[in-house]
Amino acid sequence: MSASFINEPENFVPFLDLLKQLIRVPSVTGAEHSFLLYLKRELEEIGIKTQYYDGLLVAQGNNPTKGILSAHIDRHGVICTGPNEFQFAAFLAKNRSDLRGNSLSEQTYQLIAKRYINQQVLAYEPWSGSYLGIGQIKDAFMCEEINNLIFEIEGLSHLQPGTPIAFSDKLKRKDDLISAQLDNVISAAIIIYLYQNGFQGTAFFTAQEEAGKSWRYVYEWFKKNNISTNELLVLDTSPYDTRDEADKQLVVLRNKDVNAKFKSPILKQLKEFCHKNDIDFSCKDTFIEEKNKIREENGLPILSLGSTELGRIVMESNGTIQGTTLQIPTTGYHTVEETASIKSVKAILHILSSLYIDKCLKK
């Protein structure tokens, strides 16, 4: 791998500054409008054209086919649903129509409920992003009657139904690790950073991925513009149970998910680039399949291969839209302590800038 990316290039500090800045702007699932407008301004200030649709911000440089990237920008949070009543935003009944029960997040959200206790939260106005108050989660539990997580929050009893509540967050750095609610603001930061450094392709910033809806926004854009591609590259984080598991690779690829196989020249290109540049990678579907063999031998239920935004797009388009995923391995999934290695982030930046920017990032 390029030594300059292992040994922290000068331009990595601006990336961290950008990530810190984006993390501070809330973007709860179903209430992403103010964050999308924030991204729109950041892009237009550097001369990138944008179009804002319902649930989708499309950015295009001077060479729109030189890379087609996508990243969801919603983050897990809470919605006020009544007098002193708060529910997990992504799994509200009105948001569940596209959830099939086969995503990794749906299988794990019950297990992580207690991680949110004592978490500071902030309420905001969903259109302007204006601050509406600070609170603290006192309890979180599964309510079987409504099939959702219920939160007891101190300090926000004045809120009206429909008000989004984000987990109060800031980027933390310790040694070679960074932590925050990284899923998936870190991918948005990567794309903005690439544009700042010469990327001229197309990027999609999608809403409501955590509610299983983001694929619709991208798919509809391709359909109404009568465009097909086999080079859509979706950026995201990929959860692992332990740091040891996560550190076995710098980047995570996929051959398939539960919905579809990924048949794209980009997948082969990514694998070849990683081999050539000594970047350790793994394929998440292979990792899960190997884990399931052990689970079956021990009489444990098998894990889902996971449902991705790209898999739904490939399936619904009958393969007319194809691509692959490029993910950062993390631990602490769906919390404000989600952790990634700096080497992983640098590897992703190195890969994307080498593939899509004619003149690589300044050293």
Predicted regions span which residues?
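N-terminal hydrophobic/helix-forming segments and targeting peptides
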Residues: 1-363
